[in-house]
């Protein structure tokens, strides 16, 4: 797993004023439209300032509004991916890959996305606009926050697909009857052409 993702994580060191150094695992975040440009880091394992447990979050100055960890063991470009796997953390994505790679050889070609724990419309739109034909796999944690993130992503997937459909005079009444964020089958069936 480390070899599969070796380009997609690093160790980050923060030098403190007292001479102490904090080292953590860092996952570079990029913009979906420009995956070569690093716009921040998702961090895991840094000591908290209050001395309690370890910290998981974003490095100071990270573009958390648009940036995501975007990784593919086979270096599959986002726009060419057939499978997109969405996670709340890069660490979870790598663990998923490690658990399932033997049974699913296609995972090497998949693109793994980490939102860093939060999910914004710009993050979702940035990925979905490039990956409409790809299968989107929602892999957030099975807790309340994960459920909220999954529902938000599901609604954005529906919106993106809906916006990609050509609106013809015959289709317009039905398409207009679909509630915002609902699947294509959410409209009034009697309005179908």
What positions do the PLM features span?
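Short glycine-rich loop/turn motifs
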Residues: 21-27, 65-67, 82-83, 93
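Helix N-cap/beta->alpha junction signal
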Residues: 88-89
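Basic, glycine-enriched DNA-binding surface that flanks or lies within the catalytic cores of DNA
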Residues: 1-63
């Amino acid at each position: 797993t480390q070899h599969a993702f070796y380009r997609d994580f690093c160790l980050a060191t923060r030098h403190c004023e007292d001479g102490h150094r904090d080292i953590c695992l860092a996952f570079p975040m990029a913009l979906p439209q420009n995956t070569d440009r690093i716009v921040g880091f998702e961090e895991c394992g840094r000591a908290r300032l209050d001395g309690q447990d370890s910290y998981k979050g974003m490095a100071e100055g990270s573009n958390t509004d648009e940036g995501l960890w975007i990784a593919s063991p086979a270096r599959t470009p986002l726009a060419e991916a057939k499978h997109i796997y969405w996670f709340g953390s890069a660490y979870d994505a790598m663990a998923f890959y490690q658990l399932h790679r033997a049974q699913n050889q296609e995972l090497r070609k998949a693109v793994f996305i980490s939102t860093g724990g939060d999910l914004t419309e710009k993050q979702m739109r940035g990925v979905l606009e490039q990956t409409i034909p790809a299968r989107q796999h929602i892999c957030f944690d099975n807790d309340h926050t994960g459920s909220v993130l999954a529902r938000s992503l599901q609604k954005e997937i529906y919106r993106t697909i809906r916006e990609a459909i050509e609106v013809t005079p015959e289709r317009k009444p039905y398409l207009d009857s679909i509630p915002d964020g609902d699947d294509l089958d959410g409209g009034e069936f009697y309005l179908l052409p």
